[in-house]
Amino acid sequence: GLVLAGPVGVKFSGVTERDILDMHSMPRPAFLAKAWADPAQAEPDYTAMSDTELAGVARGRESLALFGWKPYMHDPRLRRWLHRIDVPTKLLWGEQDGVVSADYCRNWCGEIAGATLETIPNAGHYPQWEQPDAFAAKVAAFAATLS
């Protein structure tokens, strides 16, 4: 089976409409307020990180800019391949996700045969970090249906 958490990468709406929040058009605190149900959980203590850990953070942001800049956060070719996914698929969406909407996730379900969507309360775009127990329970329940 396949589990997708607040997926991005596909353009469903028209050319001038945003499917995915433009994180680069706002100050970081504003983005964090949209992405997290509790923005206080969002940022680690960078001053406590080792140089290796900080380099990892920088590499992650560099990769995001490289792969998500243009076209913004999607691959124009991806949507045409979604119908080929032929394994049971569960989409998980944080109820307070301001990065992608529930409708955006429902569009994914419409492209993947049999895919279903579940929400996780008190979570934003990163339910696996904000509500790890609820996230793990939903993944485990889904996995149990695969046997």
Could you describe each region identified by the protein language model?
Residues 85, 91-93, 97:
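Short beta-strand/loop motif that positions the catalytic acidic residue
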Residues 114-147:
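Catalytic active-site module of serine/aspartate enzymes centered on a nucleophile-bearing elbow/loop
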Residues 1-30:
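Flexible "cap/lid" loop of the alpha/beta hydrolase fold
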Residues 51-80:
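Hydrophobic, aromatic-rich cap/lid helix
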